From Swiss-Prot:
Region forming the signal peptide: none
Lineage: Bacteria, Pseudomonadati, Pseudomonadota, Alphaproteobacteria, Hyphomicrobiales
Protein name per Swiss-Prot or TrEMBL: Arginine biosynthesis bifunctional protein ArgJ
Annotated localization: Cytoplasm
Gene name of this polypeptide: argJ
HAMAP family: ArgJ
Reactions catalysed, as given in the entry: N(2)-acetyl-L-ornithine + L-glutamate = N-acetyl-L-glutamate + L-ornithine; L-glutamate + acetyl-CoA = N-acetyl-L-glutamate + CoA + H(+)
GO CC annotations, alphabetized: cytoplasm
Main location class: cytoplasm
Amino acid sequence: MSASVSPLAPKHYPAMPVIHGVRIATAAAGIKYKGRTDLMLMVFDRPAEAAGVFTRSLCPSAPVDFCRRNLVHGKARAVVVNSGNANAFTGLKGREATQATAEAAAKAIGCATTDIFLASTGVIGEPLDAGKFSHLLGDMAESATEDFWTEAAKAIMTTDTYPKVATETVLLGQVPVTINGIAKGAGMIAPDMATMLSFVVTDAPIKADALQSLLSKGVGSTFNSVTVDSDTSTSDTLMLFATGTAAERGAPEITDAADKRLADFKKALGRVLKSLALQVVRDGEGARKMVEVEVTGAKSAASAKKIALSIANSPLVKTAVAGEDANWGRVVMAVGKAGEPADRDRLAIWFGDIRVAHQGERDPAYSEDATSAYMEGEDIRIRVDLGIGRGKATVWTCDLTKEYVAINGDYRS
């Protein structure tokens, strides 16, 4: 957790409503950080429906492997998250640490280890000593409360400068249901199937298979469309849980993601996921500017997204944004190197509402002064139209500053 809060941090945080059936506790275990919480326990009073997406890294952490195995059962009684150590690339010791943590949590809750989900975030390659915190889980289970969402978000932070929370309330049938989410992430952000760590809970009575479909579809335009540094973590975990307690108030049980009664819920879930994903980008390590990259006129949506990510991940584009330099030539470069269909002589580029390039050359009306003034803002929009199709995509990133280098150069110090 950084000593100074990102200038892109939210000015206000939402009041996080209670979701019946889930309670949360945090603790300071001293895993890496001193003087702050670094352990979070989420308890479901009754088995909750569970869905998840995880990193596609071929070097996944021990907790990711553990979660994948347990997700087959589709039920959850608890989630344990530690920060300061990723428990990744830790071999047998890592697997033993996950098992010890799961057994301690299962004992504290009174359930099987197959109902436990785990996540760890922090340094890769250092063995995790579960003995530092497993003994705390019993007291945490007893003291857990329904209104600890923001504190939970703080406990899972690493180099984050602020907690990331989001909430939505929407009607399912005629009954209000709530969706709450927390996330962490500031570096090693280029998710592929998930984000760094994010946990979303609803009281809607939605079965696991339907939840999984909703989540898998929802990540495409949210968490899978953000990047800070193009590095996909070994620990990426995004989980969605449903306590189902809204059924007690008359909410209908949903078993199929195609159920038309889910229309408003899907939109609300999308807003929660997008809010959390963009908060991660806005807290990118050392970030001073948020960047939206929109690509239109591509051969396909998939092609548009690859080109958008080529722009968003380009160190030259990102440093130009950091330096408030209207260097649109670097955008041309990033389009050209993406390996996707493009026609130089049909290409158009905008910074904000200012068209800077058109039909293979600088726009005749280009104004360096106007474009440079635009680059001084905190929120930068780069739009590219390829003019060869109807495919479109939007991704989000941040600038690349000297602070990013300093943070990561000193990460293990």
